[in-house]
């Protein structure tokens, strides 16, 4: 028999908070539709690609009447991409809402991600199974995967298996790529005359699936709290031993939301924000200068220790390196067959050097061989460089160390520099969800079903007013096409949901920018400690600093 921890046992008893409108009978909740919407960019291209689902109105859930809510339904659900804390509660909320509307309705889960609907691997959810996963971390209830449904054969197979199960709707829980898939499936089903609704759920710990209506993706709250605890622990170790500089790489390939939130929570000496690097056209050398400046100033005060936060995707945001990666992605997509026949790593490097254009060839040649090799490792499923394999923090340590050595020889630096590197990634993906994520995810699952009960398809579930107590939350449905634009993938233009980057004019970054100079020279660390689930509201129910600052509550 599997043992469960006392905390897990206690969390089974936690009852997630719902906004008032979702506490009503499902038949008394209606979707109030607004005006037609437009995509964020590339509107004509997207109108052609989504001829049946483009331009839908925003749906706001309000009290009203929905006579169709109680009919018997079969709904499928898929967990897609990397795990994020709270995924199980989305499924629990979806299950509870569906059963509240009609006990005879059925929820089935496709196993292992989108491949589950293609291979027809599935389970039916029961009360006893659902109850084992309430308020727990992970995606293990059905597993996840990164398969993309993109070929005509895959779309046809997904439809065939959906019809086989008599699906009325399919809910896809995932990030920007997964929700792009949801939009494409919704369009395909309508095109084929199949009355199968598709609803997306915004998931990603990176925090880059957000906009005016999606205030946060689920998992971001928990993940940043886990990382902030670890950073705080390391900062406390730094001021205890007083001899190490800790370089910490954090998740966030496409945006620096995690690094920024963790900086606001812990006050490191240096935090690099990738978006600022790109905006200021900074070189790798200038980033090194910024870190060296902090090291030298702190050494002058006798403080040969510190904490540096580095976003996982930094290297792509350095314009000169970003241009290189863009060309590499295109080159290796076009010439994959030839490249894959070369086994020796050094021969691969030499072959690539010969294919790159002028400045990109120069930048590639200037990087240490270890970084060159990492840039040429296996692509991710979308054909891009696997940025998490690039150990940027080690590159920075090497370059900072070299610069300090030169300064010491000039007599401009008299301190000691001993660096340790860390990468925080998997540690947070399956953590017990914070109270915020437990509540938010349960409400998202509930919202998804109410959107289904109102006959909507091609929408993503959303909740507004997240920085305030759940009693003030407002559930909505946002048209997926509204968030899309065209981007180059595998060397071709494809419709995708636009990633949200750190807004350099936004309140979170501005707060950070006003304080970072003081943090660089002082040891002003804050120690958040572990996530708390019980106790006063200011200890266990606080949203992220990012949310509070964005909504003017901090």
Swiss-Prot record:
What are the annotated GO cellular component locations?
cytosol
Q: Where is this site: Important for catalytic activity and substrate specificity?
A: 177
Q: How is its activity regulated?
A: Non-allosteric.
Q: Name one Pfam family in it.
A: PFK
Answer whether the UniProt record assigns the keyword Kinase to this protein. Answer: yes
* Compartments, as annotated in UniProt: Cytoplasm
Q: What is its EC number?
A: 2.7.1.90
Binding partners and assembly: Homodimer.
What name has this protein been given in UniProt? Pyrophosphate--fructose 6-phosphate 1-phosphotransferase
Q: What is the species of this protein? A: Spirochaeta thermophila (strain ATCC 49972 / DSM 6192 / RI 19.B1)
Task: Please name the gene that encodes this protein.
Answer: pfp
């Amino acid at each position: 028999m599997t043992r469960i921890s006392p905390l897990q046992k206690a969390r089974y008893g936690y009852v997630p908070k719902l906004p008032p409108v979702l506490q009503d009978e499902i038949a008394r909740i209606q979707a109030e539709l607004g005006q037609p919407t437009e995509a964020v960019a590339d509107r004509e291209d997207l109108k052609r690609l989504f001829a049946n689902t483009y331009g839908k109105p925003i749906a706001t859930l309000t009290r009203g009447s929905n006579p169709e809510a109680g009919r018997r339904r079969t709904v499928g659900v898929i967990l897609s991409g990397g795990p994020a804390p709270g995924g199980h509660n989305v499924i629990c909320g979806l299950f509870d809402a569906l059963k509240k509307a009609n006990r005879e309705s059925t929820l089935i889960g496709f196993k292992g991600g989108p491949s589950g609907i293609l291979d027809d691997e599935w389970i039916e959810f029961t009360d006893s199974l659902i109850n084992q996963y309430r308020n727990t971390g992970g995606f293990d209830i059905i597993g996840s995967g990164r398969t993309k449904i993109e070929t005509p054969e895959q779309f046809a197979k997904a439809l065939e298996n959906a019809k086989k199960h008599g699906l009325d709707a399919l809910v896809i829980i995932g990030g920007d790529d997964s929700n792009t898939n949801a939009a494409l499936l919704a369009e395909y089903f309508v095109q084929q005359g199949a009355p199968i609704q598709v609803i997306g759920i915004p998931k990603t710990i990176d925090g880059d699936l957000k906009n005016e209506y999606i205030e946060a993706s689920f998992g971001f709250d928990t993940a940043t709290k886990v990382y902030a605890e670890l950073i705080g622990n390391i900062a406390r170790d730094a001021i205890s031993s007083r001899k190490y500089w800790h370089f910490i790489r954090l998740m966030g390939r496409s945006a620096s939301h995690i690094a920024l939130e963790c900086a606001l929570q812990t006050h490191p000496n240096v935090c690099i924000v990738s978006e600022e690097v790109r905006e200021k056209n900074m070189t790798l050398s200038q980033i090194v200068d910024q870190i060296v400046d902090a090291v030298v100033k702190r050494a002058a005060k006798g403080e040969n220790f510190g904490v540096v936060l580095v976003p996982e995707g930094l290297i792509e945001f350095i314009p000169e390196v970003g241009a290189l990666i863009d060309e590499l992605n295109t080159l290796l997509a076009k010439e994959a067959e030839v490249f894959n026949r070369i086994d020796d790593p050094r021969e691969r490097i030499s072959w690539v050097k010969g294919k790159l254009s002028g400045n990109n060839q120069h930048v590639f040649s200037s990087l240490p061989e270890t970084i060159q090799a990492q840039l040429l490792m296996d692509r991710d499923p979308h054909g891009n460089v696997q940025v998490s394999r690039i150990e940027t923090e080690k590159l920075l340590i090497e370059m900072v160390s070299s610069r300090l050595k030169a300064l010491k020889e000039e007599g401009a630096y008299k301190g000691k520099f001993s660096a340790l590197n860390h990468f925080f990634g998997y540690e947070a993906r399956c953590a017990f969800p914070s109270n915020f994520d437990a509540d938010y995810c349960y409400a998202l699952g509930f919202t998804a079903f109410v959107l289904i009960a109102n006959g909507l398809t091609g929408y993503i579930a959303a909740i507004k007013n997240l920085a305030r107590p759940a009693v003030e939350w407002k559930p909505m449905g946002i048209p997926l096409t509204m968030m899309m634009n065209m981007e180059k993938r595998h060397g071709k233009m494809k419709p995708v949901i636009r990633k949200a980057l750190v807004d350099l004019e936004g309140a979170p970054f501005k707060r950070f920018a006003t304080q970072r100079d003081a943090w660089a020279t002082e040891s002003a660390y804050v120690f958040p400690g572990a996530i708390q689930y019980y106790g006063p509201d200011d200890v266990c129910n606080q949203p992220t600093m990012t949310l509070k600052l964005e909504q003017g509550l901090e």
